[in-house]
Amino acid sequence: MITTGVVLLLLDAGGCAKQRLPGGLSKLKPCRLAGIDEELFCGKLTVFENRETRTGRTIDLNIVVLPAFDQKTKAEPLFDLAGGPGVSSAGAAGFYAGPGKAYRRRHDVVCVDQRGTGQSNRLAIPREKTPQYYVSEMYPIDYVKQMRHALEQRADLTKYTTSIAMDDLDDVRAWLGYDRINLFGGSYGTRAALVYMRQHPDHVRSAILLAVAPTDLKMPLHHSESGARAMDLLLGECERDPPCHAAFPQISDDWKNVLEQLEKQPARVEYSPPGKAAPTTIEIQRGVFGEKIRSWMYGRDKAARIPLIIHHAANGDFASFLQQAIAPSIPDFVADGMYLSVTCAEDVPFITPEEATKLTAGNPFGNYRVFQQTRACGMWPRGEIPTDFHGPVSSNAPVLIFSGNLDPVTPPKYGEEVAKYLPNSRHVIVPEAGHGMDGLSDQECVDRLTIEFMDKGSAKDLDVSCVGRMAPPPFVTKYK
């Protein structure tokens, strides 16, 4: 599960990053990151891979700090916790250096690549990017075996769980000289934040949780259920939208029909890669097609094309599907090995066959993800987790929770669940959001609320009415 970034407020940096950093931040060095104009501060903190024995292999945790612009009235820092699991937190530096500068008015922003991600011993191997790769199964057997063999040369794959990583994060906090911190987690990053809140409660000032993934979620058990709910809502919007309904008057039937066709026989499509003369034949299986559609509901920008894609595919035309599925310019930003090390310890082993059958039978997305990840975890070493890992996290810290009503992986009910144990929390549902704010108008609404929450240290008096004005883009009804 991955969360996408929100468009953030602009604020002139005024060259403040060139100031001398106080306290523990002086341990960092000025640095330049690709695509970012201003000077940031970077460093490495070395931790033991095995935190219990404190011997053997070490990991250099990659740290990027974007300093607050107002050092005189500077408040507690914001620690960014990335999603995935497997996404680099340092990759978010571009947001906070550009459209997200408003977050840094009074707060340092600290991005730490969690062990196994980014430049902190990233657990991933290269893959050949043929056109078929983009529509192949998630975890082919040979790929998982090859990845495990390669990564075990430089990592104990059982030592990359969330609980271990959050102790790393607290080491970084102490090393940089911070006392209490604000946590900002999206998707899997919300689980990381919750675990940090349980393990290091005295150092949490506040938390912002966007698209909540509770510790007991058992990913990907509920992906099909959540995806089907989001799809019903999305297709319902199309049916009520005059242009979309006029273009695709039987869109719900189209959705059922294309899945039935692919269940009977995978589609074989001639595809001409850009810049190459010879076409290639691509096979599209039902499970892969469904998973692509579900993943495109994460952001409303891509979701706007789903009715078009479904309608044409139901009529045997997969051109628009492949146009969106095959995107060589998009990097592999999730470290697959880290994803497996987390979920094969914290989630998949606790999925029973009875649960999986009950939740996926008759579901349009079926058991694809459960099957793929269960099979992969059968070939992956399993890490240990604390006995109370799946229990609810209780905290008196102020917490602001955002959920998207059309989220296909972490629907609002998960935000409601965690809020029960957070008495100083507030749960805000964004009516038209998916698994993040991508594609919505007035995305600055969420940023304004988040910054105001951090400044006040309370969510009680926030005027959240602006979330009702965050509108999705119009449905795409024709090829572009």
What residue spans do the PLM features occupy?
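P-loop NTPase catalytic cores that bind/hydrolyze ATP
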Residues: I282-H311
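Bacterial N-terminal signal peptides
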Residues: I2-D12
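Gly/Pro-rich cap/lid or specificity-loop segments adjacent to the active site
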Residues: A17-V288, S341, A345-K480
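Extracytoplasmic ligand-binding site segments that recognize negatively charged/polar headgroups
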Residues: T117, E291, V334
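Hydrophobic residues in alpha-helical segments
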Residues: C238, L262, M297, I310-A314, ...
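Long, low-complexity segments enriched in small/aliphatic residues
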Residues: I310-H311, N315-T352
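Second-shell loop/turn segments in exported
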Residues: A155, P279-T280, K292-W296, I330-P331
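Short, solvent-exposed helix-helix connector turns and helix-capping sites enriched
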Residues: D241, K302, A313-S320, Q443
